[in-house]
Structure formats: structure tokens, C-alpha cells
Amino acid sequence: MTPYRSRTSTHGRTMAGARGLWRATGMKDEDFGKPIIAIANSFTQFVPGHVHLKDMGQLVAAEIAAAGGVAKEFNTIAVDDGIAMGHDGMLYSLPSRELIADAVEYMVNAHCADALVCISNCDKITPGMLMAAMRLNIPTIFVSGGPMEAGKVVLGGTERSVDLIDAMVVAGDAKVSDADVETIERSACPTCGSCSGMFTANSMNCLTEALGLSLPGNGSALATHVARRGLFEEAGRRIVDLAKRRYEHDDESTLPRAIASFKAFENAMSVDIAMGGSTNTVLHLLAAAQEGEVPFTMADIDRLSRRIPHLCKVSPSTADFYMEDVHRAGGVMGIMGELSRAGLLHEDLPTVHTPTLKAALDHWDIRRPVDDAVRAFFRAAPGGVRTVVPFSTDRLWDSLDDDRETGCIRDLDHAYSRDGGLAVLYGNLAPNGCIVKTAGVDASILTFTGTVRLCESQDEAVARILGGEIQAGDVVLVRYEGPKGGPGMQEMLYPTSYLKSRGLGKVCALVTDGRFSGGSSGLSIGHVSPEAAAGGPIGLVEEGDIIVIDIPARSIVVDLSDEELAARRSAMEARGRAGWKPAKPRKRAVSPALRAYAALTTSADRGAVRDVSQVER
């Protein structure tokens, strides 16, 4: 039997003071000796994906108490990437991931909690909590707030679904009237929950499910549907069971590092590739793997991207399907079921809810014989009412989407492509790799040669696009926006949205050492590593250079000889401290907090995690 961690502060004469403090929180004699379960909530009124989470911690806590545990809730911060987008607020988004990971670690270790429930939802919150879970390696379950419903709008007499990206795109299109822009704006985000497409938030919540760290349906059940309530309640019950198995029966299969093993990371990345998830997931999975000492790297992602088919295309890659449609088609379990039938999944792995993934698929994959309760769960439908109230609808679809030929989730024989929705490119521009979401790239530009239009910041890129300087055949190259150079690795959602609104989405490329929102599509290549501020070749490119992109060959090169690149590098190094910095001044206030982040962070190929060895002696 492994002693409960919490005994450090609850047992023994010398802990009388600590017990006195525990009693002041409401604990009674009979509570000492029970597992203490930390609930990391992320409620905030700033973020629609988190605005409904205020009472979720206590919902989980009630189930923990009923199952024989003691629940203690705390909160983390949560940044809304959409609100922080397009201005200096975005500098803080990625660094907030590290703050969240640290906050969870600090609270759990300072108070010797035995296990953890992570209530997350949006872009950096789920990754930050995942990093913390892998560091701490105590029993952990994730339960997210769920996706929002897709918006509905009637324009020109036709109803169609819309989301946040539609509002951004039409706002940059001078041909769209102010009235229509306002109509879409008012319709784009109708409910609480994470934005309704396969953007970063929903991608990451799907991937915690694929890793085995959350319950079936976590990635896809709508925030507004009563079906999600059951996930919170079940998480409270199961975490107590996991804690007792770990400490009372020495069952190490309950630990995050046992569940989220190398094979589980392969599974999660395979799901990501199959569903054409956000490119940010690459960054976050690499970071989580490093925290858990799992040797999962860009090379593994490259290998998987060449063999995993693209089975699911969701907004922003199409206007036909949204997260509510993914759920109706069976959710993550439906995608994993197709990968299983194709022989592309490790199934002998534990999860927080079943001894093996195979057992989970046997129960939850809608194309296998499943019971009526499972079928009803995946029929959970949007209520179609503007609301910030969770669990406010019990509406059901009339039927499931089990069409694997043309439905939301396809089988191997009807895949969009035999290689997946994400790809890693290498070449003299990105020796350590870069990422492209191929699910969002038009087939006509899978190979592309273009002329560099050099931008030393996202702001300059926006100005050049809206100013009419970018033409068909151009490569908008945005540098010094990486983790160190930004700092903070800004998302380039506005530049990609404005390229689309200007009719350039299928005739231009955007290449950057920054990153892209999960809402970006088009030939958008990010995470170029090493970044410019770290001495990467992207810092040597000049206006008018030619870049050659070949996605099928997984290649990206600037058309320069090795000798020319070496000469440019020598000239850059000769500038001393002035080298490897933007050639043009930027109006950007970088606070001491951001400078500290920049001093410790690494390039995207390492997940932009901190490397404290840079300052250790």
C-alpha cells in the first residue's frame, strides 16, 4: 500500500496546526484519511468557453464526497485567444499555458493533494493542465466545458451555419455590407462553450479523450446539453476510484504517465491527423510529452502524418460540419473506431474509464453493437437557443450519423486523403521542421512556388494585406513572432482571415515562426524552427526571395545556395547584439513578465517549453 500524499499534512502530532487549518475549511474527523482530490477549475467571465464553469467544480465535488473522497477546489486563469487576437494581448496567450501548468503544480504539491480533476475548455487551459498532470503524475481526470453550438444565420433567403471565423472573414471583406457583418457577428457565437469548429480548444479536448485521460464524449458533447452533466458527475466518482486504486492497491495503471504513454501519444496524434485538428495541438502535445518524459518528437509526428488517413473535415476546413456534427457521428470514439478498423491504433492501453482502449471502443464506438444509452448520448443535439446556461437542452437528433462514405466521419475507403490532415515539412528554411494543416489547403496549392513579401511582425502583415500589397503568387513571410521573438508566438488568424476575405486564400501562402489559430485555413505554414530570434534560417530571408513548398514531398525551401545562406548568416552574426532582431522597429510593449518568458522558452519543435538549463549554473 502506498501512503496517501495527503497524510503528510493530515496525520501525526506535528501536523496539529495543519489539521486545524483543514478543519477551518470544513473537514471533520472522519475526513482525515480519505483521499483529498484537488479540483482545478478555470471559471472566468472573460471567456465564453469558461463562463458557465462556476458551479461545475461543486457538481464534481458533490460526487467526490458521495464516493468517499474530500474535494478541494481552486481556480486558474484563462485567456480568450479570440478576444486577445490582433493586438498585443496575444503576446500573453501562449505564456499563460506555462502559468496555468505552474499554478496547478503549485496548488497540488503545496497542499499534498492525492488526485486531480481538471475542469478546462479553451485554448491554453487544457494544454497547461495537461502539462501539470504529466509533471505531477497523480491520478487525474479531465472534463471540459464542451463546445458551443454553431450559429445560424439567414442571408439572401438561405440559412447556413456560422462561427467566429466567419465574423472575422466578412469583417475584412469590403464587399460585405455593415448590416450583414453585424448579422453574422450577432449569430457567430450563440451559446457558452468553446468555439464550434475544430479549433484549438476542441482539438485539445478531443485529444485528452484520445490519450485516455477523459471520459468518452468529452471532446464533442455540447456545453448546453444535459448529456454533458453526466461527464462531470462521472468524473467525480471515477477520480475517487482511481485514487483508492493507486494508493490502497498500488495500481500504477491509474497514473497519467502510465495512461498517456508513448503509444497513447501516437494514438492522440493519429486522431489529430485523422480529424485535421489545429496545428497548435502539435505544440501542446510535444510540451505535454516533455513534461511527462515521454520521448515523443516532431519526427514521430512526421512519421504518423505519412500513414494516417484524413477521415474528418470540420469547420474551419469546411462549412458543412461543426462539433455538434462530430458528436452525432460518434465523437472521438467514432474516429478512433475507424482507425481501429484500419489497424492504425494501439488498443492495449489503459484509460481512466476502462482497463483497455479496446474495451472502451467495444462499448462506445457507434458502429459496433452498442446499447441504447450510448446511442442516445451521441444523439445529443443543439437546442438552438442563445444562452450561457449549461445543460439547458435535452434535444436529440432523430438519428445518428453513421454514414462513413459522405458523413462527418469517413472510413478508410472513403478518406479525404490517405495521408492525414496535418504534415511536417523540412528544408533549408525549417531544418527542425514546421507544420501545415493540410486539411485546410486547397488541392491546387499542395505544391506552390512564390515570391517572399517580408513582414517583421503580424501587424505589418495585416497592413500589407489590407493595403493591397499582396498579390496572387506571393508568400507572406512573418518572422520574429516565435516563442522567443514575439515573445509569445502570436497566432496569425487575422492575416489568414484577411487573405481569404481578399480572395487570396487559394493563391498565396503564409509562412511564419509564429503559429496559427485553430480557425486558420489555407496554405498556412507555422512553427518554423528554429525561429528567427534563435538564429533560424527564416531570419536570413529577404524581400523577393523565392520559396518552394511541396507538401506531398514534405519539403519547404528558400531558393538560395548554401553559400548565399552562409554569407547572409555571417553578415547577421557580424551585427552582434543587433543581429537576429527585427530589421524594422516595432511598437510593442514587452513587459518584464514576457521578457522572463522569452529568456527561458524554446522553439516550437520542442513545444515552446521552458528550458531552465539556459540559466542554471
UniProtKB/Swiss-Prot annotation:
Mg(2+) binds at residues 81, 123-124, 491. The modification N6-carboxylysine is found at residue 124. GO terms for molecular function: 2 iron, 2 sulfur cluster binding; dihydroxy-acid dehydratase activity; magnesium ion binding. The active site is at residue 517. The keyword Magnesium applies. Keywords: 2Fe-2S, Amino-acid biosynthesis, Branched-chain amino acid biosynthesis, Iron, Iron-sulfur, Lyase, Magnesium, Metal-binding. Its cofactor is [2Fe-2S] cluster; Mg(2+). It comes from the Bacteria. Its EC number is 4.2.1.9. Functions in the biosynthesis of branched-chain amino acids. Catalyzes the dehydration of (2R,3R)-2,3-dihydroxy-3-methylpentanoate (2,3-dihydroxy-3-methylvalerate) into 2-oxo-3-methylpentanoate (2-oxo-3-methylvalerate) and of (2R)-2,3-dihydroxy-3-methylbutanoate (2,3-dihydroxyisovalerate) into 2-oxo-3-methylbutanoate (2-oxoisovalerate), the penultimate precursor to L-isoleucine and L-valine, respectively. Homodimer. PANTHER family: D-XYLONATE DEHYDRATASE, D-XYLONATE DEHYDRATASE YAGF-RELATED. Belongs to the IlvD/Edd family. This is Dihydroxy-acid dehydratase.
